[in-house]
């Protein structure tokens, strides 16, 4: 069993519930990666069915929000992309319109789960897929695009794509979805540490602090 050398504690288990269409998961990716590295935490990515869970847990999908909230959402994205110095298209070409299937982004999440189940660190793949959608005008709902992104990121794209609809991956996706609802996840990304939720990339500083306090054995 692994322990952190400074305290003898087991490494923190950090669960990230999100969808592969979240601009906030994309924007928070580098910060989250740095936090995980500094605290030597174990990060488990948990893509889940956002469209199914969020209406049941109190969240409001962007498309159904009143116009003032939608316009403020765009304003916040613009502020954060400038503040973080990250490329982001406010209206990405391949973000779905109302006429597209509701499960358009599930396949990318399934690919991330497949990579984790193969024992790989799937964070780079996840961030590359999100960057493809939000910064590079790439259609991550397209299998060949996902394969290309995976290959470019050092993964075996065809092998992962072949596993996307496997029984093990689908079972994990359903389990993530059930767990997200049970935990009261109402937005993405939501990080969970020792049962405590941290919603949104703008709460990562609180997660950072919680991990530091945990390492010191405090509350």
Name each region found by the language model:
Residues 10-16, 20-41, 124-219:
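C-terminal cap of thioredoxin/glutaredoxin-like
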């Amino acid at each position: 069993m692994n322990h952190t050398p400074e305290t003898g504690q087991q490494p923190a288990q950090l669960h990230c519930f999100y969808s592969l269409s979240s601009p906030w998961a994309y924007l928070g990716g580098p910060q989250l990666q740095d936090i995980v590295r500094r605290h030597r935490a174990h990060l488990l990515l948990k893509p889940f069915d956002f469209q199914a869970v969020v209406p049941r847990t109190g969240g409001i999908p962007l498309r159904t929000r009143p116009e003032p909230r939608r316009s403020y959402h765009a304003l916040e994205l613009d502020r954060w992309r400038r503040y973080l110095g990250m490329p982001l298209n406010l209206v990405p070409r391949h973000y779905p319109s109302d006429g597209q299937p509701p499960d358009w982004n599930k396949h990318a999440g399934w690919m991330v789960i497949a990579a984790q189940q193969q024992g790989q660190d799937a964070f780079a793949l996840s961030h590359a897929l999100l960057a493809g959608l939000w910064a590079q005008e790439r259609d991550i709902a397209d299998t060949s695009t996902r394969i290309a992104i995976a290959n470019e990121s050092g993964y075996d794209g065809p092998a992962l794509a072949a596993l996307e609809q496997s029984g093990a991956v689908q079972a994990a996706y359903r389990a993530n979805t059930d767990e997200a609802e049970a935990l009261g996840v109402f937005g993405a990304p939501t990080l969970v540490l020792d049962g405590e939720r941290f919603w949104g990339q703008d709460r990562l500083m609180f997660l950072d602090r919680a991990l530091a306090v945990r390492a010191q054995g405090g509350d």
